[in-house]
Amino acid sequence: MDIKSALARIVGHLDLSTEEMRDVMRQIMTGQCSEAQIGAFLMGMRMKSESIDEIVGAVSVMRELADKVELKSLDGVVDIVGTGGDGANIFNVSTASAFVLAAAGCTVAKHGNRAVSGKSGSADLLEAAGIYLNLTPTQVARCIDSLGIGFMFAQSHHSAMKHAAGPRRELGLRTLFNMLGPLTNPAGVKHQVVGVFAQALCRPLAEVLQRLGSKHVLVVHSKDGLDEFSLAAPTFVAELKNDEITEYWVEPEDLGMKSQSLHGLAVDNPQASLELIRDALGRRKTENGQKAAEMIVLNAGAALYAADHAMTLAQGVELAHDVLHTGLAWEKLQELGAFTAVFKVENEA
């Protein structure tokens, strides 16, 4: 199916099949469509609402065209990632949590990008921390094999996305592509915590990941609007495990945590996020640092469970708490900075 035929279908509020969506996405991602066609397609899909078949088709093409990171094994390899777009401008919880996971002995293949709507994306934060981002897939794999953690900078692995960049920027609205980032990890992880910008997406994206072969995934959105587990409100979870999807609400108290406001956790820039994380993973000298630590524990705990490193969510949170208080997570971040500095010298020689 070509994009003109797809547009005619979408205008009539009719869904595309998975194979038809694959055809259209290949045309978009290989530069065969005009910017006007891409913009119209993205807006039409948004107004119609993307079906599970369509998202599966789009994700499969993005995965197919990605510059992949080849790991020795995917057993228990985990990613913790959000769509962004929640408007809260909270510090980089998922990225901080990734270092707690690595310090706990998990293997982490973290996928992320620069901020689109927020103040600090995962790439912005890591750059502020002195971590070199422009790695080859082989170099990322070496980070993961050696340290138990590596960062895949989305724009380095999904170069075909450049064809949609102009229309996305000019539209300035959330589109299908906002959903695709967390679903297109270049290492092909089967274990994830995926935060989304709307509760209505939790079940559908869990179904998409089920269709694409994921093993244990939590797709989450909190009642106060975050694309992660919140300290201040219940969080809705669609969990894929043993090829079945269950849906439930989780309150901080269910996991041995105390509910509290998120006041003091918003940041204006990557440096502010880094300073808060440094305090949270270190000596927690400030009230905000202590609160940030608890937010990290909550989300890292969920990812330990998704990685099957813990038997239950509550056990994952308990383990994350113990690991965070060792100070090893901050050491892991510094190790990644030193390790990638060597690659920077190699790449720029």
UniProtKB/Swiss-Prot annotation:
Binding site for 5-phospho-alpha-D-ribose 1-diphosphate: 82, 85-86, 92-95, 110-118, 122
Function in brief: Catalyzes the transfer of the phosphoribosyl group of 5-phosphorylribose-1-pyrophosphate (PRPP) to anthranilate to yield N-(5'-phosphoribosyl)-anthranilate (PRA).
E.C. code: 2.4.2.18
Subunit structure: Homodimer.
Amino acids binding Mg(2+) 1: S94, E228
One Pfam family cited in the UniProt record for this chain: Glycos_trans_3N
Binding residue positions for anthranilate 1: G82, N113
Annotated binding of anthranilate 2, by residue: R168
Family: Belongs to the anthranilate phosphoribosyltransferase family.
Cellular-component GO terms for this entry: cytosol
GO MF annotations in UniProt: anthranilate phosphoribosyltransferase activity; magnesium ion binding
Keywords for this protein: Amino-acid biosynthesis, Aromatic amino acid biosynthesis, Glycosyltransferase, Magnesium, Metal-binding, Transferase, Tryptophan biosynthesis
PANTHER family found in the cross-reference section: ANTHRANILATE PHOSPHORIBOSYLTRANSFERASE
Catalytic activity, as annotated: N-(5-phospho-beta-D-ribosyl)anthranilate + diphosphate = 5-phospho-alpha-D-ribose 1-diphosphate + anthranilate
Domain of life, source organism: Bacteria
SUPFAM superfamilies referenced in this protein's UniProt entry, alphabetically: Nucleoside phosphorylase/phosphoribosyltransferase catalytic domain, Nucleoside phosphorylase/phosphoribosyltransferase N-terminal domain
Protein name, as recorded: Anthranilate phosphoribosyltransferase
